[in-house]
C-alpha cells in the first residue's frame, strides 16, 4: 500500500519507512549504485539502490524510463552538496529495501522533460504528454479554479442544475453540431452552443439562482483561443440588476484568483463600449498597455492627402494616430514588419511619422518630422497631430485610415503587438493583472452580407432602459443591458440582463427580421413561458478554458484541456472524427452524398 506521494516527502519523514509508487523519470548507474528519480503527480523523489539488497538492485537494474514501480525504503538525508532546495523532497532520498516492477514501458515517443516537441506529436501522444509536469500543473490549476467557483457560488445561494445536451437547433450565430435521431428519421438534435434558453426557463420556474460548469459546442473556424467543444461557467439570477450581477461575479473572479494564484485583482473599473472602441479599437482592451488612439478624422477632412482625406470623407471611415514613445528608433525592417502585420486585418498600408524635433514642424526638407507623408500634409495639420497626440522627440506616430472596422482592428492589433514587444523597456507596459468591465454595448450591428441587423450578444438581451423604441426606429443607436468582464485583453466573461416580457422579445425578433412564424417555430417554447409570470433576470457566462489559459500563461487553450481538438477540429489521439459504416448510416436514415454519387456513376 502506498504511504506517501513522491513529491511530498520531506525531512519530517527522516528515518521512517515509506512506500511510493510511480514512474521512472530518470535512472542513473554510478559505480555500482543505482539512482532512480521516481515521479508521480506530486513531483519527484530520489531513490538509492545499492547491491546490499540484491533483489531490489536487480529490479532497479532492469528498469527503464517510464517503468511503473512500487518502492519501499527508509528516508534519509541526501549527502552534503547534493540537495535541491527547489523541491519539497530535495533534501532527502529513499534508500530502497524492496522494488516491485508493476509494469514495463515501451520507449516513449519523447522524453517527458523535453520541451521542444511539436504540438502535433504532443497531441498524437497526448497521454504521454499529460505526464509532463507543466501539463499536470495546468490541469491541477483548472481543477482548483472549478472548485473555487463551486465553493463561491454555493456560498452565494446558487444551485447547480444540469441542462440538456440534446436540444433543438436554433441557428442564430455559429453553426450547430447536429445529432441525427434514429427514432425520428430525418430529424436532428443539436448540441448546445450555450444553456442560454434553458437557464432563462429555470428563472421562470422559480429557481432564483442557477449555475453549472458545462460543455458547450460550436461548429466554427478555430483560433488559438477556440475549441469546437469548450467548458463554460454558466450562471443566472432573478430579481438582480446588472450592477448586482457584476458585483457577485467580480467577487467570484477575485476569490478564485486569490485562492489559486494568491493574486489580488484589485478594482474593476467600468468603461463604456463606445469609449473602448474610440481609444483602443477593441471591446476587450488590454489595459496593461498605456497606448491610445488619437482621433484625426475631423482634421483630415480639410487636407489634400488622398489616403487620409478619402478615409475621412468615406461613410463609416476613420483616421486615427497611435503615438509610441521612443519609437523613432524603430528600423525600416521593423516598420515593414508592422506594415505586413496590419495587412492581416485589411489595412492597405501603415503610414508613420518619426518625431525628431518638435521645434520644427514644417513640411519641408528640413522638417523635424521624418516620413514620406510629411510633404503631403499642411503645417497646420502637422502641428495639430503633434499637439493632439502629445508626441515628443524620439517618438513615432502610426496612422490608420480606412473603414472604421479595418482601422479599429488593424491599429488595435498593432497597439497590442508594439506594447508587448517594446512597452516594458519603454515605460508603456505594466506587467500585472488589469481587469475591467466593458458596458453599454450596442444592441445590434449591421451585417452587410445578410443585409440586416443582427444581435451583438444574442437576441435575448434586454435593451437599455429608455431605448426600447430605438430597436425599431434607430437600431444602430440602441444600447443593450450587456456587460463583459475583460482581463489583460481577454474577454473572460460576458452577460446581460435578459428580456423577461414576451411582447418585448417579439419586438427584438421583429427588429432582427425574424418573422412571427419563424419566432413561433424556433422560440415558441420561450415566448409561451415568458407569458406565465417571468421574473426580471440576468446572468453571465465565463469561459473556463480561456480563464485557465490566462491564469497559467499557457501559449494555447489546448494546453489547459486534457484531450483537446486541433485547429482543424480533429482529435489526433483517437483519430476523430472518423467515418462510420453503412449499417450505422442506414439506422439513422442517412446516406452520404459523395458515396451516393459514386454508386450512381458505377
UniProtKB/Swiss-Prot annotation:
Region span, Aspartate: 196-199
Keyword Ligase attached: yes
SUPFAM superfamilies found in the cross-reference section: Class II aaRS and biotin synthetases, GAD domain-like, Nucleic acid-binding proteins
Catalytic activity from the UniProt record: tRNA(Asx) + L-aspartate + ATP = L-aspartyl-tRNA(Asx) + AMP + diphosphate
EC number(s) given by UniProt: 6.1.1.23
Highest taxon of the lineage: Bacteria
Cellular localisation: Cytoplasm
Alphabetized UniProt keyword annotations: Aminoacyl-tRNA synthetase, ATP-binding, Cytoplasm, Ligase, Nucleotide-binding, Protein biosynthesis
GO-annotated cellular components: cytoplasm
Marked site: Important for tRNA non-discrimination: 30, 81
Enzyme class name: ligase
Record's subunit section: Homodimer.
Family label: Belongs to the class-II aminoacyl-tRNA synthetase family. Type 1 subfamily.
Function (record text): Aspartyl-tRNA synthetase with relaxed tRNA specificity since it is able to aspartylate not only its cognate tRNA(Asp) but also tRNA(Asn). Reaction proceeds in two steps: L-aspartate is first activated by ATP to form Asp-AMP and then transferred to the acceptor end of tRNA(Asp/Asn).
Record protein name field: Aspartate--tRNA(Asp/Asn) ligase
Organism this protein belongs to: Neisseria meningitidis serogroup C (strain 053442)
Organism phylogeny: Bacteria, Pseudomonadati, Pseudomonadota, Betaproteobacteria, Neisseriales
Amino acid at each position: 500500500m502506498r504511504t506517501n506521494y513522491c513529491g511530498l516527502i520531506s525531512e519530517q519523514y527522516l528515518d521512517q519507512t515509506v512506500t511510493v509508487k510511480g514512474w521512472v523519470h530518470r535512472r542513473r548507474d554510478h559505480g555500482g549504485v543505482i539512482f532512480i528519480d521516481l515521479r508521480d503527480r506530486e513531483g519527484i523523489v530520489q531513490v538509492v539502490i545499492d547491491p546490499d539488497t540484491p533483489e531490489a538492485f536487480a529490479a532497479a537494474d532492469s528498469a527503464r524510463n517510464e517503468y511503473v514501480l512500487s518502492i519501499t525504503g527508509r528516508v534519509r538525508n541526501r549527502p552534503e552538496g547534493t540537495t535541491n532546495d527547489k523541491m519539497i523532497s530535495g533534501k532527502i532520498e529513499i534508500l530502497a529495501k524492496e522494488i516491485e516492477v508493476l509494469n514495463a514501458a515501451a520507449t516513449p515517443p519523447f522524453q517527458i522533460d523535453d520541451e521542444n516537441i511539436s504540438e502535433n506529436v504532443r497531441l498524437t501522444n497526448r497521454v504521454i504528454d499529460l505526464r509532463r509536469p507543466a501539463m499536470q500543473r495546468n490541469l491541477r490549476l483548472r481543477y482548483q479554479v472549478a472548485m473555487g467557483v463551486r465553493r463561491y457560488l454555493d456560498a452565494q445561494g446558487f444551485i447547480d442544475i444540469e441542462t440538456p445536451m440534446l436540444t433543438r437547433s436554433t441557428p442564430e450565430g455559429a453553426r450547430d453540431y447536429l445529432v441525427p435521431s434514429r427514432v425520428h428519421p430525418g430529424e436532428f438534435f443539436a448540441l448546445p452552443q450555450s444553456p442560454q434558453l434553458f437557464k432563462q426557463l429555470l428563472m421562470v420556474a422559480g429557481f432564483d439562482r442557477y449555475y453549472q460548469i458545462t460543455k458547450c459546442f460550436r461548429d466554427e473556424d478555430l483560433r488559438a483561443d477556440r475549441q469546437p467543444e469548450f467548458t463554460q461557467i454558466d450562471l443566472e439570477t432573478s430579481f438582480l440588476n446588472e450592477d448586482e450581477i457584476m458585483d457577485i461575479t467580480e467577487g467570484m473572479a477575485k476569490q478564485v484568483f486569490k485562492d489559486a494564484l494568491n493574486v489580488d485583482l484589485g478594482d474593476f473599473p467600468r468603461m463604456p463600449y463606445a469609449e473602448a472602441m474610440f481609444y483602443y479599437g477593441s471591446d476587450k482592451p488590454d489595459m496593461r498597455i498605456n497606448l491610445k488612439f488619437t482621433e484625426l478624422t475631423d482634421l483630415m477632412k480639410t487636407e489634400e492627402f488622398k489616403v487620409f482625406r478619402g478615409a475621412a470623407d468615406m461613410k463609416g471611415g476613420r483616421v486615427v494616430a497611435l503615438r509610441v514613445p521612443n519609437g523613432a528608433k524603430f528600423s525600416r525592417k521593423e516598420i515593414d514588419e508592422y506594415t505586413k502585420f496590419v495587412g492581416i486585418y485589411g489595412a492597405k498600408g501603415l503610414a508613420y511619422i518619426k518625431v525628431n524635433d518638435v521645434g520644427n514642424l514644417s513640411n519641408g526638407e528640413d522638417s523635424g518630422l521624418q516620413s514620406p507623408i510629411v510633404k503631403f500634409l499642411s503645417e497646420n495639420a502637422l502641428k495639430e497631430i503633434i499637439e493632439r497626440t502629445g508626441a515628443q522627440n524620439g517618438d513615432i506616430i502610426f496612422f490608420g485610415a480606412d473603414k472604421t472596422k479595418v482601422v479599429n482592428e488593424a491599429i488595435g492589433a498593432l497597439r497590442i503587438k508594439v506594447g508587448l514587444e517594446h512597452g516594458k523597456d519603454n515605460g508603456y507596459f505594466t506587467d500585472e493583472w488589469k481587469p475591467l468591465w466593458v458596458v453599454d454595448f450596442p444592441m445590434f450591428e449591421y451585417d452587410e452580407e445578410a443585409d440586416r441587423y443582427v444581435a451583438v450578444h444574442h437576441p435575448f438581451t434586454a435593451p437599455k432602459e429608455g431605448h426600447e423604441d430605438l430597436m425599431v426606429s434607430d437600431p444602430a443607436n440602441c444600447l443593450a443591458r450587456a456587460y463583459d468582464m475583460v482581463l489583460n485583453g481577454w474577454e473572460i466573461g460576458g452577460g446581460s440582463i435578459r428580456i423577461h416580457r414576451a411582447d418585448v422579445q417579439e419586438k427584438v425578433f421583429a427588429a432582427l427580421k425574424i418573422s412571427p412564424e419563424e419566432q413561433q417555430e424556433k422560440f415558441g417554447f420561450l415566448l409561451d413561458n415568458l407569458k406565465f409570470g417571468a421574473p426580471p433576470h440576468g446572468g453571465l457566462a465565463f469561459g473556463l478554458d480561456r480563464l485557465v489559459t490566462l491564469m497559467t500563461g499557457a501559449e494555447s487553450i489546448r494546453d489547459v484541456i486534457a484531450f483537446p481538438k486541433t485547429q482543424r477540429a480533429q482529435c489526433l489521439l483517437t483519430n476523430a472524427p472518423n467515418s462510420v459504416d453503412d449499417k450505422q448510416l442506414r439506422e439513422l436514415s442517412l446516406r452520404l452524398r459523395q458515396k451516393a454519387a459514386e454508386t450512381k456513376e458505377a
